[in-house]
Design a protein with these regions (language model features):
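Catalytic Walker B motif of ABC-type/P-loop ATPase nucleotide-binding domains
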Residues: 160-164
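Conserved ABC transporter NBD signature motif
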Residues: 63-74, 78-79
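Conserved ABC ATPase "signature" region
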Residues: 103, 107-110, 114-131
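ABC ATPase "signature
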Residues: 220-221
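Helical segment within the ABC ATPase nucleotide-binding domain
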Residues: 175-188
Length: 257
């Protein structure tokens, strides 16, 4: 059981890129310990920027983010020790074998007996078997994603940050990724903060959803609560209605509590 009820606190987050491009404009939300929280919104709404700030890879212009009470700007190294991050395009050392990639990545965090245990767990998680002997450059996109995810899960992060985890994957590999994430969330209590354009995936995986438009939260709640509150049959309809309400001058995010 975590001493913290909230795994992630995002408050009044602002990010302005060079040239004055505003990616985030006062974004606030909270992710509870042990839940799967999904950010959804159109391209350019600020989802990836938010995840990169949470993962300590990008500094905000204003506001703050805390992961289990740790400020990601003031204590980035401590925050990173709590986080496992899988970007949409997870890179891999193409000339390494899958096995060598697993060992190298895990050696950046562990050593000795703990390293061997983590390597063994990553191998088991991946389910890649003999394919681990092959160079990563011969892997499909789905195999690379599974390989990278297995490494992140073997690190046993308290918070797993996933940017479009199944984008571009075939049905089989997408199902494998979703199943692994849900398994580790349920069995190991890993909190998940993710983004996705796949609304069916969000409804299957997420305990709560945060809808972002123009760098601000415009709606939040469980998928069922949001659909019921907005009189919608799916999350796409929910988003469209919330966006129209926002453009029509409604103030503040719609909450389905």
């Amino acid at each position: 059981m975590s001493a913290f009820e909230n795994a992630v606190e995002v408050r009044d987050l602002v990010k302005v890129y060079s040239g004055g491009v505003v990616a985030l404009n006062g974004l606030s939300f909270t992710v509870k310990h042990g839940e799967v929280y999904a950010l959804i919104g159109p391209n350019g709404s600020g989802k990836t920027t938010t995840l990169r700030i949470v993962a300590t890879l990008l500094k905000p212009t204003g506001g703050y983010v805390r992961v289990y009470g740790v400020d990601v700007v003031k204590e980035p190294l401590k925050a990173r020790s709590l986080i496992g991050y899988l970007p949409e395009e997870a890179g891999a050392y193409r000339d390494l074998s899958g096995m060598d990639f697993v060992r190298f990545m895990l050696s950046l965090r562990f050593s000795g007996r703990r390293l061997e245990e983590a390597v063994g767990e990553a191998i088991e998680i991946s389910g890649l078997g003999e394919d681990l002997k092959r160079p990563v450059r011969t892997y499909s996109k789905g195999m690379k994603r599974i390989l990278a995810l297995s490494v992140v899960l073997a690190m046993k992060p308290r918070l797993l940050v996933l940017d479009e985890p199944t984008a571009g994957l075939d049905v089989e590999k997408a199902l494998q990724v979703r199943s692994l994430v849900k398994k580790y969330n349920r069995e190991h209590g890993i909190t998940v903060l993710m983004s996705s354009h796949n609304m069916l995936e969000v409804e299957y995986m997420a305990d709560r959803v945060g809808m972002i438009y123009a760098g601000r939260l415009i709606g939040e709640g469980t998928p069922e609560e949001l659909k019921r509150k907005l009189g919608a049959s799916n999350l796409e309809e929910v988003f469209v209605k919330l966006k129209e309400a926002t453009l029509g001058g409604a103030s503040g995010p719609a909450s389905a509590r």
